[in-house]
Swiss-Prot record:
GO terms for cellular component: endoplasmic reticulum membrane; lipid droplet. It comes from Gibberella zeae (strain ATCC MYA-4620 / CBS 123657 / FGSC 9075 / NRRL 31084 / PH-1). FAD binds at V30, F31, E50, R51, R58, R145, D332, M345. It is found in: Microsome membrane; Endoplasmic reticulum membrane; Lipid droplet. This is Squalene epoxidase ERG1. Its EC number is 1.14.14.17. In Fusarium, the biosynthesis pathway of the sterol precursors leading to the prevalent sterol ergosterol differs from yeast. The ringsystem of lanosterol in S.cerevisiae is firstly demethylised in three enzymatic steps leading to the intermediate zymosterol and secondly a methyl group is added to zymosterol by the sterol 24-C-methyltransferase to form fecosterol. In Fusarium, lanosterol is firstly transmethylated by the sterol 24-C-methyltransferase leading to the intermediate eburicol and secondly demethylated in three steps to form fecosterol. The gene is ERG1. It is a multi-pass membrane protein.
Amino acid sequence: MASILTTTEAQTRRREQYHEADVVVVGAGVFGCTMAFALANQGRSVLLLERWLKEPDRIVGELLQPGGVASLQKLGLGHCVEGIDAKPCYGYTIFYHGEKVLVPYPGIDDEGSPTHAWGGHSTGDRSTRPSGCSFHHGRFINKLRESCIAHKNITVVETEVVKTLRGEVSDQILGVESRTMNKETGKKEQDYYFGQLTIIADGYDSKWRQEVLKTKPKVCSKFYALELIDCDLPQPGHGHVIIGNAFPILLYQIGTHETRALIDVPQGIPEASPENGGVRGYIRNFVLPALPPSIRPSAEKALEDGKIPRSMPNSWLPPTKQRANGAILLGDAMNMRHPLTGGGMTVAFNDVVILSELLHPDKVGDLGDSKLINNALEELYWRRKPLTGIINVLAQALYSLFAANDRQLRALQYGCFTYFKNGDTDGPVALLAGILQRPFILAYHFFSVAFLAIWLNACSVVGCGILGIFKFPLAIIDAVLILWKACIVFIPIMWRESFQ
């Protein structure tokens, strides 16, 4: 508690001269910056360490759902999406083999809840609907870092953390060892930073995950990225999901002239083999024909450089309970989902809101008290599930449907598109947007889609002729298989993410 009550000048001197703070945060990315800022706002002294402070150039972390915007504003960082040419996002447009349906974010009531959570859609104008935004990832991160640098309780240091420091007589983590560039010699020198609590948020490729959590993410595919210039989007201000003869494609504006295209390529598919031209061959032969005609010219131009597009692995890493021994692992290092639904930053900001509340000095006076920290982590684990569980389940389940590779999944895929086309959009998109946190509504909509898929498939199999009665047993068999597939896709992930 004493370190909180010292003067700002003394805290700054401790950080800059002695490399000591209440909290050491490793990683100045989406989670690390916001966590450092939230703790500093509570009077904590924070050291924020980052290996590379130049503007990052990444292809994910560019789409922020309305729930994430609300959390960012709650943290006092809403200004970070201003002045970076961010574009508003009002919902999604889904293309299914050329046919499209608009899925706008839902209308909400005075308490912020969607007005048609269980079914149907609202008809109000945009003034009653929340919006998200999309932007260049690097510009957004720079804004977050600038806010941290300007904060009187934060010292930001460019240094590469190489290992954690433990006590001689206990396993307690006391801080980190790093390598810092000496500007005079141009060589990296050994350095040390100490804190009552070390928060590690070093991203999807965390080098501390195995040490702290002993878990590994499951990688099912990669997103290959194109940046389309002056793309003629069919529905500006909306994310576009393309479902066709290619695996899912996601497009959204990241600036006035730039549109990001993320192309899902599962591992080992023959269409992207070297004999078929590799990833570029797959994009040219399968992705371009699946795109709406207005998008193709800019996509073709983006392929002209002859290079393999940049890629990122699409991973699933369920959350893990952890016991603090002076350090905790958070952000993408602890929990990931498929980025198709653009929910990663919304999850991160929600975690920061909850954890900063649980670690408030009124509740945890001494961040070195492992018992209090562990109690906070236990509560975080369960309190985050109503939002993060839903977003994680949706990400994995929708990817399974949109990347359908068998007859039952294709039936569910068509059922999902028809469900949206019938106007049942507000509930599902409110869950996706992070503004509806009720897992049972998610289950209701998923199995409503499943039973609609069963009905549509039965109508297709039986037909309208008199001989259709003889095909009825086939429709029954299909119904069982489709329902079974829906259960396999949904229930294990729902159980793991929301109830375990």
